[in-house]
């Protein structure tokens, strides 16, 4: 038997390919393999090149540009190509700079391809200031100009024969050729700066070594020096164009402003300049205009809009003319802009005289009355100019962006620089360092902000370099390719846990949150350190410096505010320490309200009232939303503040539950039941009313807080307030009846049933915070009781209830008004149903019938209330409708109201009740239409103005546009009227004139308090449209002048 069959296999050993796959090199192009082979890099000898290429911001773009660069060199000669190939294999620094540059900026790469031999410049160090001046001035064959200025002996030219300084030069190359060579030279120098900068964020790992990091301040200084040299060269060409071979007869100084002035310039940015000359004549003006033209065509946009009077002002002024303008006319923002002013080129001595002369005006600008509001308005205008959908992508102008840091730092400089001259520095980063060193900002906070600011500037630089284009806009979140490029070009690397883009986005979120808490870090925490040391390394502001800072932050009475801080946070108690930790954030929130002073005082009162409540500070510490909502209330509404201070436990309702805000967790009907149930437990009517007041106080605080925090609509507010009044009236009536029955000297059984009929806004469930309760009382004798006895007993009950409710207390008043009853104030307080019917049949006047349109049962005996309403329906909704005589009477009375009821001195345009297009206009229009059509449309048997408007639209009585106009005006005027009570603590109908009081009303109406002018304009626009509809519908005419009675 033969042996088992055996198969023989040839074992081949596995040898790993030493060359990385294109995917491992972060290359995604389908041509990548072929391109690497074309370069001759798909071999072991080229591993350093392959791994080096993989570190580029965008390896595919870098590879594409390398192919083009090699081809451009091949066109020169094979030796030119081989020289570059050999150099990048041997010179690691060159390799890193070249790959970082090509992968970080396709535009600069294009310049290199167009000028292929310039790769050799990447072997050099970044250009020095002197080298930049020499390169640009040599490009136009410049030489020092002759300066001969009459009547100005201080004229001085610091130009040198070696072309290494600013000053007056004259160019031999002019015209289009000058612009061409200047542009080429500028781009070449920019390429060298960018190569070193990009190499600084080229990643280092085990396979490749990165470049030396270049500090942010070094890059921005180099770019600013380049701008100085560029405009010096442009000035040389301008002088040649204007003066030819003649001496320069005017000392012209170019003052750099903005980022260039501060020597913190971007790669691509407008360069802001101002011109000062002695004398400021036609030739100096032509020279300045030529400099702007040449500079803008060759380098970057040169902008002179920061000069006095802006673009409409003279381009060139003398020093005296500048001084006269700034002393008399300049606005706050113009002094803020001067913080960055720096002599750039031309007559440097004259430029320094300009800076020295204006310096005192800069440092006293913070004493101007409008300083704080001006600075806040400037920042708000910047934000408003950013479209909402771009704010998260906007590095410069969005929230948590560069401008937030710059504005805040400049504000601190202007506040404290008046006294502390060390703060008189130009650059943002240098100013932050000084603020830290001098103790105005905590060391850790300051250094974190510097890092955050420099990181955002790094992203800004990378975005601008990519296409040599001015931009501050991040790629869209779903643009993963560009997000990846930006992250890699900025030095982020991927890992197993997250990609480079995710790492960058995560860090960016952290940075923005840090900057958004800027005011707390820069302004409020140092303030608290002046009262109590929050940390061992924090240097305390002196009391005077702290008060200066409080004034700059919008506190009108900084000494009092400082006193409040001291009372709250000083001392060694645990409460004081917690207050010291909380107050920086709380004060930041207060600063966004209409009255920070009042808000801080209210917070101190509330803290005193809550002293024995251990949960108070703990809740503020642990539930940030409570503190934020509380500060908004305390700084905007004295009305709610008083309610909360008298009921501190209410604060617990400012937090959130699992289902949402606790303020909305309680239904108004539950509150009604609670008031009635609580009152029923008290035998004494005084205690019963006291209990009702307490519950009403809490409910008013809940409604008003939810209203101020924009959690309730105007309709929901009015309905909730009406339900509270209904409950109080019902509970009070019940308490009075029980007290009367318990009085041994009075009957022990009720002699009548009593019902309370709501009139006016109470009847329509449209009460405001300051509204009285307009009511009528109706009674019905119980079986076996004479009518006069029942009425007498009912009058005693109702009178007692009204008196008890009206007793003075610390709560908002409870006034019950009977002015709409038959015969007005001289009529009987209580009537039976029959008595009411007889009165209306025999003596009822048109205005009384009109008033019945709002009658609704609100409290007491429900059946009796319904019976009363049914009995008056024939008067208010007559079968054949209102007569023409009644309609004329309504219009006649309305005309008298318009002419006679408006209080003396009131403004008809802004009176929320009796003003043009305001509440009375709208409600009378709706009531007139109800009287005209209710007999045909039963749905109009409704006491609510807004609901009746819906019915009128549904049945096409008036058109939808008219209905919407009246509805919007009613809601706007009602909201304004409610806001007036919230901010003034009492019923007012007249909007304040523009200023702080109107800012409060705007804030309470859900607007930014600083936008009070826009709020007023909106109110006027809405009510003006409403008045037009009233004229058309109520009066039936096109203008007020056509009415006759």
Swiss-Prot record:
Positions of disulphide bridges: none
Required cofactor names: Mg(2+)
GO BP, one annotated term: regulation of glutamine family amino acid metabolic process
Catalytic activity: [glutamine synthetase]-O(4)-(5'-adenylyl)-L-tyrosine + phosphate = [glutamine synthetase]-L-tyrosine + ADP; [glutamine synthetase]-L-tyrosine + ATP = [glutamine synthetase]-O(4)-(5'-adenylyl)-L-tyrosine + diphosphate
Family matches, as Gene3D superfamilies: Beta Polymerase, domain 2 (3.30.460.10), Nucleotidyltransferases domain 2 (1.20.120.330)
Record's GO cellular component terms: cytosol
Chain intervals for the UniProt region annotation (Adenylyl removase): 1-527
Annotated stretches, region: Adenylyl transferase: 533-1045
Keyword hit for Nucleotidyltransferase: yes
EC number, UniProt record: 2.7.7.89, 2.7.7.42
GO terms for MF: [glutamate-ammonia-ligase] adenylyltransferase activity; [glutamine synthetase]-adenylyl-L-tyrosine phosphorylase activity; ATP binding; magnesium ion binding
UniProt keyword annotation of Transport present: no
InterPro entries documented for this protein: GlnE, GlnE_rpt_dom, NT_sf, PII_UdlTrfase/GS_AdlTrfase
Record keywords: ATP-binding, Magnesium, Multifunctional enzyme, Nucleotide-binding, Nucleotidyltransferase, Transferase
Protein family membership: Belongs to the GlnE family.
PANTHER family: BIFUNCTIONAL GLUTAMINE SYNTHETASE ADENYLYLTRANSFERASE_ADENYLYL-REMOVING ENZYME, GLUTAMINE SYNTHETASE ADENYLYLTRANSFERASE
Described function: Involved in the regulation of glutamine synthetase GlnA, a key enzyme in the process to assimilate ammonia. When cellular nitrogen levels are high, the C-terminal adenylyl transferase (AT) inactivates GlnA by covalent transfer of an adenylyl group from ATP to specific tyrosine residue of GlnA, thus reducing its activity. Conversely, when nitrogen levels are low, the N-terminal adenylyl removase (AR) activates GlnA by removing the adenylyl group by phosphorolysis, increasing its activity.
Protein name per Swiss-Prot or TrEMBL: Bifunctional glutamine synthetase adenylyltransferase/adenylyl-removing enzyme
